[in-house]
Amino acid sequence: VTFAAVLDAGNIDYRFNTLDYTPALDSVVGEWNERSRAANGHWNRTKSPPRHILFCWDSVIDKKVYETHLTLPDAAIDKMRRSSMYKNYLGKTAYYDSVQIGLAPEGKVAVWIDGIGFEPNHRVIPAVLKTVSGDKLALCKGITKHPNGYKYYGDTPEFIKNKVYPYGVW
C-alpha cells in the first residue's frame, strides 16, 4: 500500500503516507484464512473506528496500480466500539480495535476485524468495495513504488516459478 485516506466514524479525515510495515504472513499462501494476523501497527491509527477507507496499492504480479474504496458496514463499526468478552494478554478489557486488509492478484481485497488473543479474526463484508486500475484511477494515478516498472526480488522468482496465474483461491 502506497497511500491511504481514512474517514473515521467520528468524521475525522486521516491521510497516511508513512504506512505500517506488514511482515510476510507465511501461513497466508494461496488462500485467505481466519487465524493469521499482522502485528499491530504503530502509525496508522484513527480516533474512532474507520468507516471509509481509500487506498492505493501496487500488485507486482499484475504489474499495475490499484485503487480500492471500501466502506465498513455499521455492524462492524458497532463491534469495534464495544469491548470484547475476551481479555487482552495483560488480563484487561480488550476492544476490537484493529482492521486487517488482505490484497491478492486481480485486485481482490478482503477485510477482517482482528480477533482477541486466540480468537479467530472476524471476516467483514464491506458495505462498499470497489477496486479499479488503469484509466479508471482517480486519486491513485501516478502513486506507485515501482515508477520504473515492476521487478521481482529475493525469493519471489523461485516462489512463482511454475505456478499458474492467478495463483491461489482468493
Predicted regions and their residues:
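Tryptophan-paired
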Residues: 12-61
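Extracellular interdomain linker/stem segments of modular secreted and single-pass surface proteins
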Residues: 74-79
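Compositionally biased low-complexity segments at domain edges in trafficked proteins
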Residues: 80-155, 169
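Beta-strand secondary-structure signal
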Residues: 52-56, 69, 100
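Intrinsically disordered, low-complexity linker/terminal regions across diverse proteins
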Residues: 160-168
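Edge beta-strands of extracellular beta-sandwich domains
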Residues: 64-71
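A structural detector for beta-sheet-dominated domains
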Residues: 2-8, 15-19, 71-73, 102-104, ...
